[in-house]
Each structure stands twice: as structure tokens, then as C-alpha cells.
Amino acid sequence: LVRLSYHAYTDWNARTPVDSASMLVEDFATDPAVDQDLIGSLAMRNGGLRSYVLQITARDLHRDAQSTLVMQVGRAGDGLRHYFLPVDPQNGVPLFDDHLPAGSQVRVRCEAFKGRTLFGARHAVEPGLPAPVFTSGGSPRPADTADSLFQVTVDPVEGTFDLDLRAPGIHHLQPEASNPEGYSLFVLTEAYPVVGTATDMLGPLRYITSRPEHERILGAPDMRKAIETFWLDAAGDRERAREAIRIYYARVENANRHFTSHAEGWRTDRGLVHIIFGTPNTIYRNERGETWIFGEENNLMNLTFTFVRQNGPYTNNDLVLQRDPMFKGAWYRNVESWRNGRVYQN
């Protein structure tokens, strides 16, 4: 038995909701061992607000556990994104994600554009990694120029169109050729968001390896075995190595699920900080971005990372770290801890 509730606020600083409601969901499973999605809807009264902050809470009444999501709906700069919804082409079930693995086939619902022709462009994303937290570099960005153009026609009755997403990159669709406002689908690696192959494991390992170490593993006849050897040498025994691998790549997958923008979550600034430093003790969010605090908030020894939201035509989940040379010592301490096989939570 789960209670779903929401509270809608005018902005991030508001304390009194303009609307709230809740509902109970009781799930009767014929086979408890099989995971299934429960999809429904709950009508909202937003008082005519075009933009508001929504807090959604799901509470398991049997287990006395809950999960909360806070998001801004109708953010300025979002443009036309909310008019599009990707669904499974086989059964029409919403995918609730604009990031899909390469090779996916997707159907997009956009009833507001029935019968219209949409102009599409594919943009590649830089293949590199974000710079360390203390340097002046940045994170991978989309290419300014599209490498291919295409058009799709929205079904005049169903209000849908289908796409075959074979090539990685940003597939951006816009109703007007001269206006970049539109909707983007992000095509990532085949295993996204999980770490499924040796190649998936090697990429994030670059954060804690030197260039020669990385190249040696890349050129090894058995890459997965070489990666396991790296962790075993770092940890000193198999049990510690297994635990370090589990936690390191769990953070990679967690970054993919929460921080993916135009690049996989582990290749973003927030993903970088999460993998190396762990989960912050405190997070502050507002329309400008996020602040992560590791340690006690009023302690002068804490670490505070500030991420600034970037407005662009493709995504509203692109936050860039304000890098600072003062982070250099903490960065190398954490990297060295990982290299010694110790799971570090700052």
C-alpha cells in the first residue's frame, strides 16, 4: 500500500503550497517476484501558474519508507519540451526518460502538432571527460553544427511519430526551422544507464588512473581482467576489491540515472563529484542550480560545490561546476583513497 502525494509551490523559496493532494495505491501482484510498473495520473490545480515547483512523495505504508522528488515544472526556457512524451512503440507505455540506449525504437506523442512536419537535426557530443574540480576546464559539450538533418511528419489522427535511434548523439526536433525551441532525445551507449561491459567500466576508471595506466588497460588482451587486476592491486585482497568495485560503479549508475544531460551522467560535473566524493550531506536546489555540502554545514572544514544551471535548447538538466583551485587537496586525497582500495565518503 503506497500513498502518493504532491505539493505545488510558486517558486523554490515558497513555504506554503498553492495546491496539494494525495492518493492511495494498492498493488495486487500475481507474482511478487516480477517487477512491474504502476502508471496512473492525478489531476492538479495549479491556479493558472505556468511555472511552479512540485514536490512528489511516495510512501510505502507497510515498510514505513518513502522517496521524494522535487522538480520545477514549466521552467522559463523549457520552451516546447512539455508537449512531447516518448512511449514504447509496442504498447504505448510512457518511457519517462528522454535518454535512450543506441539502437532504440521510440514513438513520440505530441498531440499539439498533429499533421505538422517537424525539422530534425542530430548533434554529436564531445567524447571527453569533465576536468578535475580544481582546474579551469569544463565538461563535454554538444557540437554547434549538426552532422545530419531530417524531417518527420506527425500523424494527423494519433498525434505521434516514430524514430529509429541508431546513432548516438542529440536528436533535436523543432516545429519551426528558424526557431531552435523544440524537443530533444539523447541517444547514449547501448548499456545505458547500467555498467554492462568492460568498456563501460573503463571510462569512469579514468578519473582515478594515470594516462599510462588507462592506456595499458585499454590495450590489454582481456580488458575486464585488466580492470579487475587494477582493483585487486589497489585493495590488496579480493573481498575489499569486490566491495570497491561494487560501490564505485554503483555511483556511476546512480550518476547516469540522475545527472544525465547531453552526456551520460558519469561524464557530467555532478557525476564526477558524486563518483569521487560520494553523496553530499546537504543539497540546496533553486532555479539557478544546486549547492552540495560535504560535512557539517557550518564547519569551516566542509567542502561546498556549486553547480550553475545552463540554459540551452536541448536540456534543463545541464549544471556546470564552479571550479576552484582550493579543491585540489581534497581531490587528490579522495583519488588516492580510491587508488588504495578504500571507499571514500568525504
Question: Which positions does each model-derived feature cover?
Answer:
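Intrinsically disordered, low-complexity terminal regions enriched in Ser/Thr/Pro/Gly
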Residues: 1-147, 155-157
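Solvent-exposed coil/turn segments that connect beta secondary-structure elements
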Residues: 9-13, 59-61, 297-299, 310-312, ...
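Edge beta-strands of extracellular beta-sandwich domains
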Residues: 65-74, 180-191
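Low-complexity, Pro/Ser/Thr- and charge-rich linker/hinge segments at domain boundaries
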Residues: 75-99, 186-212
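Structured core of small recognition/catalytic domains
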Residues: 119-181, 245, 256, 260
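Early exported N-terminus immediately downstream of N-terminal targeting peptides
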Residues: 194-245
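A cross-family detector of function-defining hotspots
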Residues: 223, 231-251, 256-266, 271-316, ...
